Amino acid sequence: MSAHGDPIPMTAHPSGPLSGTAQVPGDKSISHRSLILGALAVGETKVTGLLEGQDVLDTARAMQAFGAEVIQHAPGAWSVHGVGTGGFAEPEDVIDCGNSGTGVRLIMGAMATTPITATFTGDASLRSRPMGRITDPLAGFGTTAVGRRGGRLPMTLTGAADPVPVRYTVPVPSAQVKSAVLLAGLNAPGQTVVIEAEATRDHSERMLRGFGAEISVESAPEGNVITLTGQPELRPQTIVVPRDPSSAAFPVAVGLIVPGSDVLVPGIGLNPTRAGLYTTLQEMGAELSFENMREEGGEPVADLRARFSDAMQGIEVPPERAPSMIDEYPILSVIAAYATGRTVMRGVKELRVKESDRIDAMARGLEACGVRVEEDEDTLIVHGMGPGGVPGGATCASHLDHRIAMSFLCCGLAAQTPVSVDDGGPIATSFPIFEPLMTALGATLTRDST
């Protein structure tokens, strides 16, 4: 359902060629971090291009609850008057993070070494997700956490009064875990060290450095060793948020799979730790080009152009690529359904603990649309049916997951018959303009009466 309402059933109808320019919203990962680091800096941080989806708005409200002044001046233009490292005030009420796993986990890290108590909750999807992967390393600083059985929300954290730095090896590749530990390390004396065997998105490291933290990243036999020196005074910044590569995946996808389409998606952040999908699509033979390559705010940026691709071939996606495209496997599985041959996605068990069990959700939905799918705990295999080969005609469960809902709506635009989702409401968490943006390209999306 929508963040605070009834389900919004939606249907995507087979559409003619899609064309035009798709201005997708600002990057969700960078938007969350801009607000949180701005709240931990001393002075005014200015942000333009902020994603104003429900997830990020929930983080903005949380920063206000912890004592920062967060102001929207115009669409996408915000300022944050920070309280300094260790300056968070104790919230008077429960912190509701809605659907956002990123938001709740980063905020837990940011408050973990300040001697205050806060209670966190979220929607039904977020309350089902495990938080032990965050609270376990935070306990090393001296933070205590009490939640529901299985380490689930609602959960109350009490920050460490006398935090000690930690040395932590991330057991499963996760930028959220890494970032939570680094944010906690900001208010711990000495050096906090995070070791990750596989590189994950590095926005936190880049942005911490930009805000004035002393942070280094070194390669070692065990992986990336990230060292943060605690208790800096973070300097406020002026941030221009690049457009979200995860959101861009949806207009790119329909450009590739709807016959005759030609879609331009400008200003997309192409951080190497986020660009795995686009590398994969090129390997499949997609008509995908990168134009006007440039750097903005320390992040590589380009305009993406996606044209209908009738010669895409299924491939084996290297499992080591998973951290750089973990959010894009749902839409990749749809694109794979319109390729020829098998697309094998291994090393994706992390998908089972996202907003939904995304492996199961995509497998069941694609099967309902007439696509042959195989899965095990760590693998998803899609047997492509070629251009225009997906029968469609199904209603797919979104499981309160924005990416599942958008993926199946994209599927329906290229299928032989319409594809519906039981609830398009969660799309607002990350991509509130998805529906008008797709419609402007020529897509036919309808909201169905319940």
UniProtKB/Swiss-Prot annotation:
Phosphoenolpyruvate binds at K28, G101, R129, Q176, R358, R403. It comes from the Bacteria. The keyword Disulfide bond does not apply. Disulfide bonds: none annotated. Keywords: Amino-acid biosynthesis, Aromatic amino acid biosynthesis, Cytoplasm, Transferase. It catalyses: 3-phosphoshikimate + phosphoenolpyruvate = 5-O-(1-carboxyvinyl)-3-phosphoshikimate + phosphate. CDD domains: EPSP_synthase. It is found in: Cytoplasm. Catalyzes the transfer of the enolpyruvyl moiety of phosphoenolpyruvate (PEP) to the 5-hydroxyl of shikimate-3-phosphate (S3P) to produce enolpyruvyl shikimate-3-phosphate and inorganic phosphate. Belongs to the EPSP synthase family. Monomer. This is 3-phosphoshikimate 1-carboxyvinyltransferase. The gene is aroA.
